[in-house]
Each structure stands twice: as structure tokens, then as C-alpha cells.
Amino acid sequence: GSTGDGYALARAAGHTVTPIFPALVPLVTREAWVKDVQGLSLRNVRASLCHNGKKEQHFFGEMLFTHFGVTGPIILQLSRRASELLAAGVQELSLHLNLKPALTHEKLRDRLDRDFAKYEQKHLHNGMMDLLPKCLIDIVLSAAQLSPDSIVGHISSKQRECLVRTLQALPLTIVGTRPLSEAIVTAGGVATREIDPRTMASKLVHGLYFAGELVDVDAYTGGYNLQAAFS
């Protein structure tokens, strides 16, 4: 970390400094249920960031629930765009989690029907044990407006369709990011058009050079940002 004085010094030298905001940063959700599953790590899921019904970005991989929201590799990758939109004044964003991205809607429905045939006389919560981590089952059922105490055999075809849709787009509302002090990378900085890329020298002030986070360069992982600084 740093004091951030470099940005003020760059401005004083006449340089343009683009808006600063956290990137590669955990996201804060409105939903309180994340606290009930904090510490739960999911692998092979797809997270999609949406705004006004439009999918902004999506990434496949691992994520982690926390007491404040979500983090992990795919969340950090999405966070740059989320943070940019929030910094621009967007009040909230939608995050859709596809918990079974390897299956098409039809194949997931077939899988659900097979499980439900096997657990026909059991409560719905127990009928989902082969599909989801135990602590996540009731959350998904609630999002699909289903009771965990319902009998599996009583779940209608329409309700099953709703459950499949929920499994492939479990909704979360993004209302913020963790503070800049917790971010891996800072987005924004001294405009690259004002820097000579061969020497990193200022095009405006002789003898002034820039490097690292001070420059308006960032990417999806910390490794890329380290390489940019070293280069």
C-alpha cells in the first residue's frame, strides 16, 4: 500500500489522473444469507455480472462466500467492472451464479428428475443432497420459492423448472466493494497517453518517471499487474 500522494504530485505536475477505484476486490452483497454460508467455497461455477438486464461479464472457476458477500478468483475478475460501474453512480448490480454450468437446462432437468425419482418420499431438502452442499440447499429452495419440508414426489413440473432456473442463475445483489485498502489492485491513475511507453518518462515534465500502480494500467489478475510494473 501507499499514501496515494503520487496521484496528487502527478496532478501538480500537470498530468491527467483518471478516476481511482478498487479492482480485484471482494464484493459486498445485500442478501444476508451469505453469512449463513460464509467459508463455503464453490468450484466449477459460473458467475455473471448484470446491469439493467444486460450481462456485462462472466467467468468460470472458484469463488468463496464471506460474512459480507463474495470473493475468490472469478469474483475478483468480475470486480473491476463492478467497481467501475459502482464508482460511476450505479446503485446496485446483479450477480447470477450458475451452480451447474457443465449441464444444459435440459440435462440438469433430467438429473433433477432422476434424483427426485430416487428420493420421491423424502423431504425436498434431502432430495437435493446429491446436487448441492448441505448449507446451500435451503437458500436455493427459498430463491425458487419452495419449502425444504415439501415431499419430493409432490413437486410439480412447473416447480422443477423454476428450481432448474434457480440452480443456473442464483441471484445476488451487489451493493458495493470492500475498501481500497483490501483491493489487490488500484484501477485508474496517470493517463498512459502522457507517458513514453519505452522509458516510462513523462511527456510533460523532463526527468519525471512513472511506474506501477501510479499508472492507469490494470488487468484481471495480480500477476499481470506485477508484470506491467516490472516491464
Give residue ranges: language-model regions.
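A conserved FAD-binding loop/helix module that cradles the flavin
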Residues: 1-13, 217-231
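Conserved active-site and cofactor/substrate-binding residues in soluble primary-metabolism enzymes
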Residues: 1-5, 73, 103, 107, ...
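Short beta-strand to alpha-helix junction loop
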Residues: 1-2, 28-32, 152-159
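Short hydrophobic core segments
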Residues: 1-3, 9-11, 63-68, 208-210
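Domain-scale detector for complete catalytic domains at protein termini or as standalone homologs
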Residues: 7, 24, 94-96, 124-130, ...
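An anion/pyrophosphate-binding glycine-rich loop and adjacent beta-alpha core
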Residues: 15-21, 25-151
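Glycine-rich phosphate/pyrophosphate-binding beta-alpha loops
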Residues: 26, 70-73, 185, 215-227
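A glycine-rich dinucleotide-binding beta-alpha-beta segment and adjacent secondary-structure elements
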Residues: 138-218
